[in-house]
Swiss-Prot record:
This is Aspartate--tRNA(Asp/Asn) ligase. Belongs to the class-II aminoacyl-tRNA synthetase family. Type 1 subfamily. The record marks 52, 104 as: Important for tRNA non-discrimination. It comes from the Bacteria. HAMAP family: Asp_tRNA_synth_type1 (MF_00044). The gene is aspS. ATP binds at residues 242-244, 251, 499, 551-554. It is found in: Cytoplasm. Its main location: cytoplasm. It catalyses: tRNA(Asx) + L-aspartate + ATP = L-aspartyl-tRNA(Asx) + AMP + diphosphate. GO terms for molecular function: aspartate-tRNA ligase activity; aspartate-tRNA(Asn) ligase activity; ATP binding; nucleic acid binding.
Length: 610
């Protein structure tokens, strides 16, 4: 702030008055033509100030909207006298009378656009320094600047709308679950570190040196113990913690709608979850969604979309063409364990520059390149066309339904890479070509997930969801004899290409749980040390049970059309896992470390004094 502006702000402090017995009668978005003639009191922040001759106009803002107020020397000379001091983001209390705006001056884009409040008296509740960016929906401020001044960023109307919608979503979920006789029960934040899954955040114990609590990645074990306890319908809107790499739709701390039910199978859990999402969509956006949601198996999703959370709003599909090109002279096709193709109708007009950009994009997912063919009248244009025989071309036409004007993209290699590269390219093409309709919400279930997935780094099988997921009927022995073939009683709800929630029927047999731990490479002693309390609980009359958890942040991100979950979390971390506003994480004093029995091998640069 310049010295001149600082002096002005300091000078204006003399005008600041206490709130006293003034009380708001309305928010800044409530007043309409029906209130004309009424005396009101509104309070908020100055969005804009405009001097028009003798009149001073101020747009007053709170989290709900704007109201135009007018300082008129004819209506209230005393109120008008000092109005010239008002600046953007000053905090005002206004008493005045509602009157219609002059003819031709109404604003149909505002709920309060037919009226204005002419000021009879007012108070300056506080001044404000000049903000580092404009408090408007359209801002050129970088995200880092906005996060450093988050309390100002949250004043922007879009951000306020995001959090009002988030509140409505939470209230809607609570009402729905309460109607179904669920109990809202809190579970511990300080718990025990367990293997599997993402890294835990550890909290040292001051009273037990060398011992650590872990912040929960989810309330999974505790909600299962509640089922054993007889609390047969549980939910919680709960904060969870995972020490994992950040991205646009992930945070170190996040919120989920956590649900568990006893005496149920998959159908009952999924039906309950569909009803919940239908209610939330109706209560927040006024959108009716059709239930039951479509379903597809994990194998179908990976086969046709390359991902386990397909966006079905547009119809590009992947096709396995391995057999069609098995004998090809193009060696990459001939030798690859899997060759997949994606036909893009009308894509023949793509430029080489666009294709080169897509080629660079798929390299993110381990691909070496991107093969393509343009289908033109009388010819196939492509660097690989000369390697394809007439029989192979005919087989591709039959498999893909190729027509003149199409372009086909190919990927060949290991299934994991092929699916990741083409599956993500599919989404990028949908965005690039404008194939994805706005304001469309495509829900679906993905079912029959693998029970295990192979971890190349650890050279062992790990749980695909978590180690408490029940195998499908008839797959019990496969847990140890053929882990890759074992399927889980698991289900994910997907919305527009995002995993919205995931759940499963749980293991409620102590013997099956022991077998699961053994299949994951946990020896009996380690399993007892880490999960003995759970196994013991399962030996004491555990009912069949299952549940689901929805990512609250991700849900609200999708409902608000926000590009990142950081826009729907009040005080999020950056992608470097820092808080730019509070400067967390931070060093602590040597005394605090001594109290915890901790000695650092390297002293942080910002070590706190004693």
């Amino acid at each position: 702030m310049s010295d001149q502006i600082a002096d002005i702000q300091l000078e204006h402090q003399q005008y600041v008055a206490p709130l006293g017995d003034w009380q708001r009668t309305h928010s800044c978005c409530e007043l309409t033509a029906a209130d004309v003639g009424n005396d009101v009191c509104i309070m908020g922040w100055v969005q804009y100030r405009r001097d028009h001759g003798g009149l001073i106009f101020v747009d007053l803002r709170d989290r709900k909207g704007l109201t135009q107020v007018v300082f008129s020397p004819d209506f209230a000379p005393e109120a008008h006298k000092d109005a010239h001091i008002v600046r953007s983001e000053y905090v005002l209390a206004i008493r005045g009378r509602v009157r219609p705006r002059p003819e031709g001056m109404t604003n149909p884009g505002m709920k309060t656009g037919e009226i204005e409040v002419v000021v009879s008296e007012w108070k300056l509740l506080n001044t404000s320094k000049t903000p580092p960016f404009l408090i408007e929906d359209r801002t050129e401020a970088s995200e880092n600047l906005r996060l450093a001044w988050r309390y100002l960023d949250l004043r922007r109307p879009r951000m306020a709308r995001n959090f009002m919608l988030r509140h409505r979503a939470a209230q809607s979920a609570r009402r729905y679950l309460d109607e179904l006789d669920f109990l809202e029960i809190e579970t511990p934040y300080l718990t025990k570190a367990t293997p599997e899954g993402a890294r835990d955040f550890l909290v040292p114990s001051r009273l037990n040196h060398g011992m650590f609590y872990a912040l929960p990645q989810s309330p999974q074990i505790f909600k299962q113990l509640l089922m054993v306890s007889g609390m047969d319908r549980y939910y919680q809107i709960v904060r969870c913690f995972r020490d994992e790499d950040m991205r646009a739709d992930r945070q170190l701390e996040f919120t989920q709608i956590d649900i568990e039910m006893s005496f149920v199978d998959e159908e009952r859990v999924m039906s309950m979850a569909e009803g919940l999402m239908s209610r939330v969509m109706k209560d927040t956006l006024g959108v009716d969604v059709t239930v039951p949601f479509p379903r597809m198996t994990y194998d179908q999703a990976m086969g046709e979309y390359g991902v386990d959370k397909p966006d079905t709003r547009f119809d590009l599909r992947l096709k396995d063409v391995t057999d069609a090109v098995r004998g090809s002279e193009f060696k990459l096709f001939a030798k690859a364990p899997l060759v997949k193709a994606m036909r893009v109708p009308g894509g023949e007009t793509m430029t080489r520059k666009e294709i080169d950009e897509f080629t660079e994009f798929v390299k993110i997912y381990g691909a070496q390149g991107l093969a393509w063919i343009k289908i033109r009248e009388g010819e196939w244009q492509s660097p690989i066309a000369k390697f394809l025989s007439e029989a192979e071309r005919a087989a591709l036409v039959a498999a893909l339904g190729l027509e003149v004007g199409d372009i086909v993209f190919f990927q060949a290699g290991e299934p994991g890479m092929v699916n990741a590269a083409l599956g993500n390219l599919r989404v990028k093409l949908g965005q690039h070509l404008g194939l994805i309709p706005e304001d469309t919400y495509n829900f679906l279930w993905v079912t029959d997930f693998p029970l295990f997935e192979y971890d190349e780094e650890e050279k062992r099988y790990v749980a695909c969801h978590h180690p408490f997921t029940s195998p499908k009927d008839g797959h019990f022995d496969l847990m140890t004899s053929d882990p890759a073939a074992a399927r889980a009683r698991a289900y994910d709800m997907v919305l527009n290409g995002y995993e919205l929630g995931g759940g499963s029927i749980r293991i409620h047999s102590a013997e099956v749980q022991r077998r699961m731990f053994a299949a994951l490479g946990l020896d009996p002693q380690e399993a007892e040390e880490k999960f003995g309390f759970l196994i013991q609980a399962l030996e004491h009359g555990a009912p069949p049970h299952g549940g689901i958890a929805f990512g609250m942040d991700r849900l609200v991100m999708l409902l608000t059309g926000s590009p990142s979950i950081r826009d729907v979390i009040a005080f999020p971390k950056t992608q470097k896992a820092t808080c730019l506003m509070t400067q967390a994480p931070d060093a602590v004093s040597a005394r605090q470390l001594r109290d915890l029995g901790i000695r650092l091998r390297e002293t942080p640069q910002e070590q706190k004094p004693e």
